[in-house]
Amino acid sequence: MAYIYLIGKNLTKNFTRDEYSRANRKTDGRIKIYPETFVFMTALQLFRDQIGKPMYVNCWFRTKAFNKRCGGIEKSNHLRGCAMDWYFKGENMADEKKFIQYAQKWKDIINIINCTDLFGDIQGEAGMYKGFWHFGIQNYSKSFYHWDSRSGKQINMPFKELR
């Protein structure tokens, strides 16, 4: 793990360090970035370029303490900066067709990154919640992993279009 100091506020063209670290930054301005975080940031920027509209970040990197407070799972990809909860302003985030459409774009981007063979075998993940979506990268599954948690209970792999 490395600590880096950034000049300016952006991690990528469209994502800022404030979005990345919200409430988790050290008081001296340091942020925790893992090697796989760079892969995730690259994938996010490719996704953002493809969709052509702003993504509003609820949560990206989490410390263990913050993750516990907000009810995150023990091995959350947020702990490595490899997951982001986000939404589109003014859009219905409960629309399954839109979720599937955007999750498929995310899946395609991760597949392209895997074709480069630079980062090992990673898989994408996408979750649907009330009011926001979760996108991430992971290596615990051999395929794109997705879920629906809008009811408050997680239903794994519910969308046949994403299998």
Stretches found by the model and what they are:
Residues 1-48, 130, 138-142, 146-163:
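Extracytoplasmic cell-surface/polysaccharide-interacting catalytic and binding patches
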Residues 28-29, 55-61, 105-109:
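N-terminal start-of-chain detector that recognizes signal peptides
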Residues 40-43, 66, 82, 95, ...:
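Amphipathic alpha-helical interface surfaces
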Residues 42-71:
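Extended, low-complexity, intrinsically disordered C-terminal regulatory tails
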Residues 55, 84, 133:
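A broad, low-specificity signal marking well-ordered, structured residues that form hydrophobic/aromatic
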Residues 75, 80, 88-163:
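Catalytic cores and adjacent binding grooves of peptidoglycan-active enzymes
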